[in-house]
Amino acid sequence: MIYSDSAMAAILLCTNLGIEGEYKPLTLKEWNGLGKTVNDMGYKIADLLKSEFTKKLPISEKQKEQIKLLTGRGFCIALKLQELENKGIYIVTQFDNDYPKYLKRKLREKMPPVLFYAGDITLAGKIGIAIVGSRDVDDAGMLFAKDLAKKATKEKLIIYSGGAKGVDSISERAAIDEGGYVVSFIGDSLSKKIRNKDVIQNILNKRILLFSDVNPDTGFSVGRAMNRNKFIYAAAHGAFVVSSDFGKGGTWTGAVENINNSWTKLFAWSSCEKKGNKELISKGAIPYVISEQTILDTINLSPQKDIEAYRQIDMFTTEKDEITENIKEDTIIDLYDVVKESLVQSIVGEMDANDIAQKCNIQKGQMNIWLKRLVAEGKIKRNKQMYSLPS
């Protein structure tokens, strides 16, 4: 995988991959503040990779030291990224063309600078709806969630969801069984999730895309589950609440947050007996029952203040999105350039590829590729199956 300088800066500064010691990655608020400072100085985020530039920043010495420590772990990051890729997990940053365009457009300073993902990332650029609701949904709610997901799929819409039990998993399964596609923003345990047999098969079939804004090995927390709600709403063309408690729970909190921020049009199943649905309607959610009208027509014809009315876009058409920085002007980083000096230093005497791979904790296939490049550059020499440093 090849990353731009700006993307690598985001990965180094905003993730905890390979961090040892007491220092921590930047918070979203710190990252946005740093970005503004760099921009106001007339520089780019990529310049943070230059130690001399960091010294010029009008920030505290403690902050400078934090940036120095975070950006100085390039070799470790390269190994971690390779480890993730071997599992089928990749990274996209706000500086990449593949970053979900609606998150960037709607969330702005609230968008996560780095997302981990598994699956076909082009799905994130497709028009779709969010189907959300309680874990303890009743039988009628289950049936409604299934029918809505099936209707959306027949109309070539992606299902955006949160991957939780209850409404999330019911709508996801219904869409996939109907031949549709799912983009799921999960709040924890991406590494564990992709070990599920059904998930693996759906990823291979390009039916599901999983996103997480936290380290793939991070476990569950209520805060992280709540935080990912905004991603679901921002990514969707419209959001449909199947079943919600009143004044509590992730469904209620996420729906109210969406109403307050106007990320997407909000609909609530009007036949649900739960008080939460009724209260959401009183707060501005649009009452909804399944009808002959297409979902996109329902969304576009339903008035709701301060919400952008998107025109229908075919599911298989991806719009080009503007990016915050001109990638053409950005230097591209090959992970090989990050690790090559450390690889050379790891060779003692004569060693074969397997020994070097084990010493550096890198898969042999990847090591063979890098060793071949080192030989071609004259940094090491090869004699049959053995590698050594030049005399």
Question: Where are the regions that the model predicts?
Answer:
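Glycine-biased, small-residue-rich flexible motifs in mid-sequence functional cores and linkers
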Residues: 1-27, 43, 86, 93-391
